[in-house]
Amino acid sequence: MMTNKLHLSTLGIALLLLFGSCGGAEKKVAENDGLETAADRVEKTELPPKAEVGEGALVRAELIYPLENRPTPQVHASTLVETSNGIVAAFFAGTHERNPDVGIRVSHLENGKWTRPEEVVNGVQNDSLRYPCWNPVLFQPADGPLMLFYKVGPNPREWWGMLITSTDGGKSWSAPQKLGEDPAIGALIGPVKNKPVQLEDGTIIAPSSIEIEQDGETFWKVHFEISRDQGRTWQVVGPINDGVAFDAIQPSILIHDNGDLQVLCRTRQGVIAESWSSDQGQTWSEMQATSLPNPNSGTDAVSLQDGRHLLVYNHSTKEGEEPNGRNILNLAISADGKTWEPFMTLENEPNKAGYSYPAIIQSEDGMVHISYTYDRETVKYVVINPSDI
C-alpha cells in the first residue's frame, strides 16, 4: 500500500544508465537531463582514507576464515546476530553462486576466535534434484528461538523462502520449513538480505523484495512480510514501488525515535533510495533518491541505541576512476536518516570481486559489528565503537 505523494529529488531524476546484476536483466535507460548525477556527487565527496585498527572508531578487523585451505571456493551474503552465546555469522558458500552445491554455513565467535564454518542446511529436494541456497538472514526475536531465514531455488525470480530455528544459539537447528505463499507476491521470501526489526508490541517486520519478469524486462520491487505470531504466519505489505521510477531491492529498516520507520534500498538507478512509514509499516511513502550513490550493490543499516543511524555501503558508481563499483566500502552516519555523512572507509583497494553485501548489527554492549564479502573468497568481520564516532 502506498501514499500518493511522489517527489523525486534532483539526484533521482538525473538517473545513470541502468545496470543489471545477478538476478536482473539490463533494461530501460533514463535520459540525463543535465542535472547532477550520482557520479558527479561521488567526485565531489571527499572520503576518509582507509581506516586502521586502533585509529578512531575501528576496534577490530579480521577474516572469519583464512584464504588458505578455505572450506569452499566462494562465499557471499553474510549475516550477523547476537545470541546469549555470542556473535554468530552465516553465509552461503559453494563452488560458485547459483551452483546446486551452494549451501548455508554458520560460524560462531567463541573465546575471541571464529569457528570453522559448517554447513547447516542445503537445497536438496530429493535424490536427483538439488537447488542452490541464497541470502541467509539471522534474527533473534525478543521471545523465541533464533531464526535463520534463507532462500532456495534456481534463481532470484523463482526462489522461495525457508526457515530453520535454534534454541541453543545456533549449535543445532530444526528441520527446514517453507515460509508459504501469498496472493500478492507468490512464494513468501522472508527477509531478502537484511535483518528484520521487531517493534515494541512484538511485531516482526521482514524487509523483502521480488524480481518480476514482464515483456522481456525485469522489475525490482520492495515489499514487507510482517508477523505478529513469532513467524508462524505472515502478512504482505506492498510492493511499495512500481519498478519503473526505481528498480529497488534488498531494503534495510531503520527505526526512528518518534516511531517512524525508514527503508534504504539498493537500486539500478545509481543511488540508494528511501521510503518512510508512520504507521508501523502498514503504508509507505513513494520512493525517493537519497544523496548517497549505489553501484547496484547491497547495503545494510542499523539504528543505534543513542538514536543515530549507521549505513554500510559502497560509496561509488559503476563507472569512473578506481576504486569504483564494489571496490570501495564505506560507513555513513546520520542523526535523522535524511542527511548522511561518510565517516569511515573500510576498504578501497581494488581486487577481483570487491567488497560487498555487508551486514551490520549493534550488540547489547553498544559495539557495532559488521561483516561483508571479501573478494568472494571469505568474509571479513569488523567491530566499531560508535562512541568514538
How would you name each of these model-derived features?
Residues 2-11:
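Bacterial N-terminal signal peptides that target proteins for export
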Residues 18-21:
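C-terminal motif of bacterial Sec signal peptides marking the signal peptidase cleavage site
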Residues 23-389:
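Asp-box/BNR beta-propeller blade signature and adjacent active/binding-site loops
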